[in-house]
Amino acid sequence: MRRAVVFAVSAVALAACAGQSSSSPRPNPSLITRDEVVEAGISDAFQLVQKLRPAWLQKRGSTSFTQEGDVRVYLDGTHVGDREALRGIMTIDIESIEYLDAGRATFRFGAGNEQGAILVMTRK
C-alpha cells in the first residue's frame, strides 16, 4: 500500500515538473519575423518595434558629450538613418527585422554603431 502511495505521488510530481508544450515557440529577442509583422497588424516599423521589441529603441551604455548616438537603421543593408527612419518604413514591405548589439553592428558596418543597429529586410 505504501509503495502505491509513493508511486502515485511520484507520478503527480513528475507530471507537474514536465514542460508544457506550447503551440508557438518564444520569439527570438533579436529578430522579428514576417509572421510576427503580420500578426501585429501595425502599419509602420517604428510602432512595430515599439510594441514587439521596445528595448531595441532604448539607449545603452555611455555616450560622449559631442555625439550622443542613437541606434542606426539599415534597410536592405543600406544605412537610412536613426530609429526615426523606422517611421517611414511600412510593414507591408517587411520580411524581417533584426537587432544587432553594438559589437556586432560595429563589426559588420564599422564605426558609428555604438548603440547597435536595426536591420530591416524587405520582401523581394
Residue spans for each PLM region:
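Bacterial Sec signal peptide processing site at the extreme N-terminus
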Residues: A11-I32
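Short, polar/charged loop or turn motifs at beta-strand boundaries
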Residues: N28-F46, Y74-T78, R83-E84, T122
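Periplasmic plug
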Residues: F65-G103
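Post-signal-peptide N-terminal segment of Sec-exported extracytoplasmic proteins
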Residues: E36-S64
